[in-house]
């Protein structure tokens, strides 16, 4: 069992029941999935860029990503329908908790000029999105072997009904929110 999964079961569930007055432990919000998405606009002109992006995301997530393709052609961006434009991976279960642990304790503190993450990035339904500007903040990525700095989006999907419940859940996982 992952460290954060044990913290959730032993400490967070009773704490959230007390805080929000749930009648059953099954009402307590929990993480359902974490999706990592990397848009690779340079892949339009150079196919090798997509291979290195897939390799980076594989190292970060510990699981092979799916290459996302354009749904329709956009002439202004020189994109044709079906062309590879990014990659994404969905984490669930133990891998999700392991990634979240590394993200909060190792990767986020390595961000330059880090002062906490915004508490405004909730979507109104209890899900949280955070953008990472450089993939080199993850310890799995070797700085010398990086061909280009790429950002990625981390979407944390919870079963929480409100943003307040989701923020309490993520704060219990020691998310460094700004005050």
Swiss-Prot record:
Belongs to the universal ribosomal protein uL5 family. GO terms for molecular function: rRNA binding; structural constituent of ribosome; tRNA binding. Keywords: Ribonucleoprotein, Ribosomal protein, RNA-binding, rRNA-binding, tRNA-binding. This is Large ribosomal subunit protein uL5. GO terms for biological process: translation. The gene is rplE. This is one of the proteins that bind and probably mediate the attachment of the 5S RNA into the large ribosomal subunit, where it forms part of the central protuberance. In the 70S ribosome it contacts protein S13 of the 30S subunit (bridge B1b), connecting the 2 subunits; this bridge is implicated in subunit movement. Contacts the P site tRNA; the 5S rRNA and some of its associated proteins might help stabilize positioning of ribosome-bound tRNAs. GO terms for cellular component: ribonucleoprotein complex; ribosome. InterPro entries: Ribosomal_uL5, Ribosomal_uL5_bac-type, Ribosomal_uL5_C, Ribosomal_uL5_CS, Ribosomal_uL5_dom_sf, Ribosomal_uL5_N. It comes from the Bacteria. SUPFAM superfamilies: RL5-like. NCBIfam families: PRK00010.1. Part of the 50S ribosomal subunit; part of the 5S rRNA/L5/L18/L25 subcomplex. Contacts the 5S rRNA and the P site tRNA. Forms a bridge to the 30S subunit in the 70S ribosome. It comes from Verminephrobacter eiseniae (strain EF01-2). Disulfide bonds: none annotated. The lineage of its organism: Bacteria, Pseudomonadati, Pseudomonadota, Betaproteobacteria, Burkholderiales.
